[in-house]
Amino acid sequence: ITAAAMFAGCASDNGSAGGSVSTDGSTSMEKVIGALGESFMANNQGTTFTYNPTGSGSGIKAVLEGRCDIGLSSRSLKDDEKAEGLKETVLAYDGIAIIVNPENPVNNLDLETIAKLYIGEITNWKDVGGNDAEVVLIGREGGSGTRDGFESITGTADKCRYRQELTSTGDV
């Protein structure tokens, strides 16, 4: 229902076919927005639907600059973005998982311990019941909605010490 309401405003109200809807933003939305776009085009013959997977921050910026119709973000809008007139509609909820190499016996980490790992207070897995090995952190790049969500949940905004910062959730 939310998706139908979101796209309803993009269709022509005079029954004529044609036009386009462009979306830009969150890479974690790729599968969902692809399916919604296909359905939208099937129900609106002659209308094209495009998706540019640039990341949440870029999608928000694209809407502000008028380069797309719908910005996709896996984070909430910031106060300054709302002040510029942007409105948000929740389309879905995204999950974030912490993954440890299966050869490392670590399990059941609490949120406080995860935060300590990510800000560098804990640097060896043996300190949390794992192997005697360096903690290597891989995550999303700055501007990513997934990263923003993770750092908001863990209280580690702008403090994480990533070894690698990747440009898509799939790459992580």
What role is predicted for each listed range?
Residues 5-9:
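C-terminal motif of bacterial Sec signal peptides marking the signal peptidase cleavage site
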Residues 10-172:
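Exported/periplasmic ABC-transporter solute-binding proteins
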